[in-house]
Amino acid sequence: MELFAIKGMPEIKPGDNIPYHIEKNIDLIDGDIILIASTIVSKSEGRAKNLSDFTPSERAESIAKSFESLANKPKDARLAQAILDESSEILIETPFILCRTHFGHICVNAGIDRSNTGSHDILLLPIDPSQSALGLKKQFSSNVSVIITDTCGRPFRYGQVGVAIGWAGISAHRDWRGKYDLKGNELEVTVQCILDELASAANLLMGEGDGG
């Protein structure tokens, strides 16, 4: 397996053709796997918003006040409302908001980003990352797979890693159940998440901060 970072990508704006910019900067062949940060997919889909777009509900105000009392720092109730709007379920409200997005991803703050947002305040995740991945896949001239990645924390582990939140043209998992180990013991529960392993590998090249 070889990994290549794509150089020369411009800052993506609403409506930009991401596959065009990728193919302009790297030669692709059938079977390649393209991993794309959710940040640029969201930007191309016009998911950058301002906090003024959100009117806090009573619940958002309550969450913001609870956070402020526990963390001893303010939380904008408009951001809390954006998180509520982007979530199908709130699992934990304080000391952080752990939620399930409408497409089933479990994450903090509905994956809303406050960095690399351009002239806007926040950047929401794509509405349906797997549909986004499928749409991107169809635009490439080669038969490639597409994985959309995001950075995510892990329970009881320090630091964040890249994970897959949408994909097209590739199997998500490798099922080892029914296979045997070196001692002849049958594997009963092992299902390998290929997508997240590839996302973490790609994140080593993507980096964080000013790479968005």
Name the predicted role of every residue range:
Residues M1-G212:
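N-terminal and secondary-structure boundary signal
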